[in-house]
Structures are given as C-alpha cells and as structure tokens.
Amino acid sequence: MEKPRGTEEAPSSEPMEEEEEDDLDLFGGYDSFRSYNSSAGSESSSYLEESSEAENEDREAGELPTSPLHLFSSANNRSLDGSGSEPAVCEMCGIVGTREAFFSKTKRFCSVSCSRSYSSNSKKASILARLQGKPPTKKAKVLHKAAWSAKIGAFLHAQGTGQLADGTPTGQDALVLGFDWGKFLKDHSYKAAPVSCFKHVPLYDQWEDVMKGMKVEVLNSDAVLPSRVYWIATVIQAAGYRVLLRYEGFENDASHDFWCNLGTVDVHPIGWCAINSKILVPPRTIHAKFTDWKSYLMKRLVGSRTLPADFHIKMVESMKYPFRQGMRLEVVDKTQVSRTRMAVVDTVIGGRLRLLYEDGDSDDDFWCHMWSPLIHPVGWSRRVGHGIKMSDRRCDMSHHPTFRKIYCDAVPYLFKKVRAVYTEGGWFEEGMKLEAIDPLNLGSICVATICKVLLDGYLMICVDGGPSTDGSDWFCYHASSHAIFPATFCQKNDIELTPPKGYETQPFAWETYLEKTKSKAAPARLFNMDCPNHGFKVGMKLEAVDLMEPRLICVATVKRVVHRLLSIHFDGWDNEYDQWVDCESPDIYPVGWCELTGYQLQPPVSAEPNTPQKGKDTTKKKKKQFGKKRKRIPSAKTRPLRQGSKKPLLEDNLEALGVSEPVPDDIIAVCVKEEHQDISSLDRSPSPQLPLPIESIKQERNN
C-alpha cells in the first residue's frame, strides 16, 4: 500500500504486546490516559514513568520531535533578555525560567516543592530498583515525573470533565454541550477552511496528507461484540479536523456515512490493528454481503493511501505548550486598554491562556492565545515606555491554587516575536493620521492618530473623535501590525471607513480632513502590506473567538477577504457583531479544533430566540446590543458584562437596560498577529447570505 513519506516504519515507542482492555492502545505508542487525573494512583505513576522513559529514549534516537521546552536546555548559555540571565528547566516539572529565580544553589528546580518531590521519588525509585535486583544507577529515576505527551494526550482525548473556574465547560462536558459540525456542513453544503490555513494549530503543515479517498482503520460502531473491534473506512470528505467516513463494503451507499475527528483515539492508519493484535470485523449491516472479505479488502487497499504511522504521536507533540500554570506576565488591562497589568497563567487549553490579574478578584480573568500581541514578558512595559498599572494593593490570593503555584516570570522566548524595524530614513511621528481597526469595535476601521511613538517599533494610537480626553482609550499596535493601514486603504478596497465622531462632511475625504486638521498622513511605505497565499475564501466555515467575550469560541463564516484581512461573521448573529481579523490571527481555528482540545464551541442561534426571558425585556432593541452575546453561556456566577460592537463603555446605561448586578466593563483590545512576507492575490467576492438553522442556546451546567 502506498503511504505518505515518513510512514514506512512505526515508531519504536509503540508497544507490541496485547493489552487486556481494547481502549488502552492510544496514539500508536501511548497507553491509556484514563488515570491521568488521579496523580496519586500507583498505576498512573507507573505509566507516567514508563512513558517518560520511552519518550526520552526515542527523542535521543531522533524519532520524536523535540518539544519547545527541550530547546531551552540546549541554549542555556544564551541570555534571556540581554540582562545576562540564563534559562533553566526544572528537572521535576519541566517548567522554563531563569536560573536566578530557581530554587537551591544548583538551580535544578523551580521551587522547594519540586526539589522535595524529586528527592522523595528518587529514593523510592532506588529502593524499588534494589528490591527488583537491579544495580543502582548514578542518575535516579523519578517515579512521578509526568511525560508531556501523557498530560497533553490525556487532555487531547478529553478524559477530564468539569468546568473551569469561570464556568467554561471542558473535556467531555464541553463535547456533550457541543455542536454537530458534520450535520451542519452536510445539510447546507458548506465548505470548511482547510487546516493548512491556520499556522497556529496542530499539524497544520502536514494536513495535505489527509485527502479524499484515503483509507483508515476506525472503531466499528455497528458490531455487537464484547470487545472493541475495528473496520476499514474511506475518507469521503474532509472539513477541518473532521472527516466524513464510509465503511468499506457500503460502496456507493451513503446511508451509513459518519463524521469523525481525526485527532480522536479511534482512527488509525492501515496496519495499526495488525501491529496491535486488534480484530477487523465488518459492520453487522453488511456482514453477509461478501463471503471472502479478505480478498475484497486486498483489492480495495491496493494503491490507496493512509495516515502516517506517527500521525497521532505528532499530533500530541504539536500540542505541547510551553506556558504553564503559575507563570507571570504582562497583559493589556481590559478595563483601560492604554495600559497593562500583571497577570498569572491559570489555565492552558490548546494554546489559549486564561490569565488572572494579580491585583484583581479570583475570577477577574482574561483569555487570549499564547501568540497574542496583548501579552508580554515582565518588564516589557518599562522597556518600551508603555503604561502599566502599578498597585500597592494586592488581593489575598493565598486560597487560590494558581497563585499558590507561582513559579517564575515567563521568559521572553515564549512570546511571539515581532518584526524588527528600522527607523532610518523617516519613521512614524506623533500626530500622523492613518486607518486602524478599532479595538473596542472590531468590526470598524476608523480614522486614527498616532499619539505616541514607543521603543521597539510600538505605537500608541487613538481613534479620532473618541470620548476620552485623558488618553485612556489609546491602544498599542506594533508598526508591523496588519491592523493599521495607510490613508485611503478603505477607499481603495471598498471598505466602509468610520469617520471621526461629529465629522459632518459626507462622504469622508482624506484630503479635506488632513487640510482641516492641519495634519499629515503616515507614509504608505511604513506599513507592512505583505500578503501570503493564505487560502481563505468567502463562505468558508471556521471556529472564531468572540474578541469582545474572548472565552467564547463560536461557529463563524468568512464573510469577506481583502488581501490578508478577513471579515468574520458569527453565524446566527447580526452583522453588527462582525469582526475584522488578520488571516494569521491566533483567534480563528479550523472546524473541529474545539472538539480536539475539549473546549466548548458556541453553536449558531437565531437572531430572535423564542425564549420567555425575551418577553420580559422592555427595551428589546438595546438589550440585544448589550446582552445578546452574553446569553451564549450564562455563567454560574455574576460575570463582567461584555458589550456589543457600538458602545463599549456605557456602564451608566446598564441599570436602564434592566441588567441585574452590573460590574465594571471588560474591554478586549486589538486582534493582531505577527506577519510573514508572502504574496497573494486579492479576493473581494461578495459575501453570500447563508441560511441558518434555528438552534437552541447551549447553557453551562452549574457545579
């Protein structure tokens, strides 16, 4: 059988012996992760030890990709930020930090807890080795040192259940409340954006191996047997991480087709069952269709393609994220976007970080991706001249598990790098005019002014005609950002430009405005207008973060493509909630990403849900603007209310709208990402009006 390159041999870490239970053999080399959550269990500990050993041996042999964390250990002579600090990796938990912040003279551990755990487990391992008659070794083995692949693998398969502290369902709870992409795509003949369009997701650069017609071994759900059995299926259609499969033997009969996520445990390359002594059994519906199934399969498999043998291992490796719970960093202040605040990483899901503000309450959080331009290493604000909130008051967080586990500051290498800038020959100046995406209304591109030029290419920008006079609505963009544009960009690309508030001359003309304000436009040569061949097309479906409520990921559609700029429409919501994002934004994901990571996906809803609560609203029109998106996940607790797209700072009007127990508004700022120099053509086809089914709003379960 023909296979993609690099699939000739199975990884050496794959166990060959037969398991007692059929669900133990996951990822072609990683055992069951069911007991991952019970770290005190001896069975889990034994597995973690064995997995860590096998993983290390394979990595030394060059068979497994090196994780981001291991890259630091080989660069321990490099300075982190030019201050002479050296990176260090904790030998117990694998966290990355600076040597000066680590515990003990040897700087081998990030905390006294890790040091004691390592010492205790080393002694246990030594005693166990002697009892087994093994000679003592110089390098002690740590019994409870969990392999990264085990942890991420456990999360990848959503073995855990429950909710985060902010009420967001995860794991199986999220999948139960989830959304059926397969039915949605098939019923309306929608097309999903390919995984290869998203450079921040697992295996984006290898998804070309997944194609129509390829064969896989998949769990047979149409069998009445005491154990799990498998059968061969053909990929009929690929939609993001999800594929439409048809069991071999049904031929042209599509009545039993089913959707499956390729990142799940039950899909394997051809040959996996033979290697792992699993049984291939045809579905009960067609069991009597052929008498010689072996000959039939041989004919069907000749010349076909399958998944790489290490597909799931690479999937797990690509989901190793260097950020860990307890790392400190600087993040934009959601209540005042012109400054940053200190925060601590609380949760990492699929590269998305839930951050807790150090000077806030235990539920004062902020969600963003680890590649977001809104987060920075500690000291960034002071270095570039950006404002930061300094508070003498620090809330008592001793009871909070995240703040009890603060290890160290996140090192600069963990953050997305920005493009180097050269200011010779003219640079941005204060007072220059330009066009920019409004971070408080991401569906609008506005006339803006450079208010301050910071170091390292950063700019403080404000929207002309804004309500603030003290600079509290300024926001920071890097000069290479694709969220800022030269004057006349909107005019040239037929995009509606939002004029300054109070500007009466219609239509807006840049020449007239510059003359009236006695200002000049920023030179077009200073903007980064590179456009890669991103592959997005109008009408493609994806999963997108609602940046005004960034803990929500919703079903969305690419409404318009302008060079590398995408207009994202949230299915079921009004156009006023549309958002402009860059084609390489880390806040958009392929179909099936939420299912892959165990995150809850918000389904489309009707524009006017028929619910009893709606009948109680006296000002329905305004209520829709402020409270509509919040109804996607009613929180178990009183949550800060995120506004709609038009008026993000109207706290005084909340009582008039009938909102109970209002709290300070949460403002989510810029949606930008680092760029690469490529060339692509302009796609400006109009957006179709897509029919949307009426779906019920999914609600969180209270713990």
UniProtKB/Swiss-Prot annotation:
This is Lethal(3)malignant brain tumor-like protein 2. Disulfide bonds: none annotated. It holds the Pfam family MBT. MBT repeats lie at residues 179-283, 291-391, 397-500, 508-604. SMART domains: MBT. InterPro entries: Mbt (IPR004092), MBT_L3MBTL2_rpt1 (IPR047356), MBT_L3MBTL2_rpt2 (IPR047357), PcG_chromatin_remod_factors (IPR050548), Znf_FCS (IPR012313), Znf_FCS_sf (IPR038603). Phosphorylated. There is a cross-link at K698 (Glycyl lysine isopeptide (Lys-Gly) (interchain with G-Cter in SUMO1)). Keywords: Chromatin regulator, Isopeptide bond, Metal-binding, Nucleus, Phosphoprotein, Repeat, Transcription, Transcription regulation, Ubl conjugation, Zinc, Zinc-finger. It comes from Mus musculus. Residues 15-25, 50-60 have a biased composition (Acidic residues). The keyword Cytoplasm does not apply. The modification Phosphoserine is found at S13, S67, S338, S681, S685, S687. One of its GO terms (biological process) is chromatin organization. CDD domains: MBT_dSfmbt-like_rpt4, MBT_L3MBTL2_rpt1, MBT_L3MBTL2_rpt2. The gene is L3mbtl2. There is a cross-link at K405, K647, K673, K698 (Glycyl lysine isopeptide (Lys-Gly) (interchain with G-Cter in SUMO2)). The keyword Membrane does not apply. Residues 35-49 have a biased composition (Low complexity). Residues 73-82 have a biased composition (Polar residues). Zn(2+) binds at C90, C93, C110, C114. Putative Polycomb group (PcG) protein. PcG proteins maintain the transcriptionally repressive state of genes, probably via a modification of chromatin, rendering it heritably changed in its expressibility. Its association with a chromatin-remodeling complex suggests that it may contribute to prevent expression of genes that trigger the cell into mitosis. Binds to monomethylated and dimethylated 'Lys-20' on histone H4. Binds histone H3 peptides that are monomethylated or dimethylated on 'Lys-4', 'Lys-9' or 'Lys-27'. Ubiquitous. Residues 619-634 have a biased composition (Basic residues). It is found in: Nucleus. Residues 1-85, 604-649, 675-703 are annotated as: Disordered. GO terms for molecular function: histone binding; histone H4K20me2 reader activity; promoter-specific chromatin binding; zinc ion binding.
